[in-house]
Amino acid sequence: GKKMNTENNQVDSKLPFRKLFPLGLQHVLAMYAGAIAVPLILGGALALNAQQITFLIAADLFTCGIATLLQAFGIGNLLGVKLPVILACSFIAVSPMISIGKQYGLTTIYGAVIVAGIILAVLAPVFGKIIRIFPPVVTGSLITVVGLSLTSVAFNSAAGGTGSKSFGDPKNLALAAFTLLIILVVNKYFKGFIQAIAVLIGLIVGTIVASFMGMVSFSAVSQASWLHIVTPFYFGVPVFRVDAIITMTIVSLIAAVEALGVFIAVGNIVKKPTSTESLVKGIRAEGIAQLLGGVLNSFPYTSFSQNVGLLVLSKVRTRFVCVCAGIILIILGLIPKFAALATTIPAPVLGGATLVMFGMVAVTGMRILFEVDMNKSGNLLIIASAVALGMGGKIAPAAFALLPHYLKMILEEGPIAAALTAIILNLFFNWKEIFSDSEPIIHIPDELSS
């Protein structure tokens, strides 16, 4: 029994700071591109100014850090899966947030994020039952549609950013293509940590090249202060609207189903299999992290699978590496100058990089759909209907123009339409199975199941 014990202690073993810090920093760098992409894209889509976007990025990094501490360090027996995981903005939430923001503004996004977080935290103990309604056929359809529908956002950035004077200028497209190329080259010729930060390298190299083309302005950095405490409700008192809350709650539940897969995978990697109890604490922490996100002007958080890849690479299994990463994120979030640096990334560079990122989201969804038994009653039809309905609303939103606005919001928001279609059709075709006592299927990210 001794060996089992040392394996278990690996997760909780404390390393000296000089070892923890570089590893923690690696985790921060691996999730950094994804973490700043969400506020940059949301800010761009909602036409916020550089100062507001700087604030969003700072709030995001700060809250990422707190959310990571809640999961990796945990709070007693209440919160946290206590595994080496890093929390960052969920990409699944990006397109619903843009829709809510365009229709109602930022404060309604935060209202919806807060309520959805509370709902998730409250539902944590019965999450095992809820998961039956979200099998791979549902989550895979939603995540595929999310990735596909976000490509239009990435394309707009690649062309110069919505509303930009030079929109569609060939040099914008060339810069986006160059950034994409850098990411592909790094992925082909490097291994390990360098490969894990390929997108970040693409963003940095792309921005350097753009600065020689006179496309980068550092005024936001010089104007930003060195220290600023993140202010709760900076953009105003949150507004609560039912349609926005329903949208956000569906997104949060599906992000939590994803997170469960990550927890189980990480548990397997660090040889500390997850108990039901630790999973409940993990889901509860996801909800509380999201509630904090809404209060601190940030976003819904979820455990990032990119970082799990690093765990496998670095062979260091202790959760204190992620605790260290969380502390680094909190410190970065208090330094607006650092957040302002990210706002200097020109739209085409961001577009080239997010094109790959969102493409990967779609592929993740497809990977989940690979697990679905296509010969079984209705599964093919469920996916076909969900993806078609989800993409249809995105491509031809005018179709819903005459509907009441709450219905319009949900149908126009592709991923939500896809998820609801898949949930309803799955209940229709497979209800016997869903309500039987069989084990629910939880998707475990591919690169992690080895």
PLM regions and their residue ranges:
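Short, non-helical or kinked segments that cap or interrupt transmembrane helices
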Residues: 55, 78-91, 132-141, 194-200, ...
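Juxtamembrane interface elements at the cytosolic ends of transmembrane helices
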Residues: 4-5, 35-39, 43, 178-189, ...
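Intrinsically disordered, low-complexity non-transmembrane regions of multi-pass membrane transporters
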Residues: 1-23, 218-233, 268-272, 282, ...
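Membrane-embedded helical hairpins/re-entrant loop segments and their flanking transmembrane helices
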Residues: 17-19, 43-82, 247-319, 444
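Membrane-embedded alpha-helical modules
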Residues: 100-219, 324-326, 330-439
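Hydrophobic, small-residue-rich membrane helices and short re-entrant helix-turn-helix hairpins
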Residues: 12, 189-201, 226-230, 235, ...
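Transmembrane helix-boundary motif of multi-pass solute transporters/channels
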Residues: 23-61, 78-105
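Hydrophobic, membrane-embedded alpha-helices of multi-pass small-molecule transporters
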Residues: 18-31, 35, 168-180, 197-198, ...
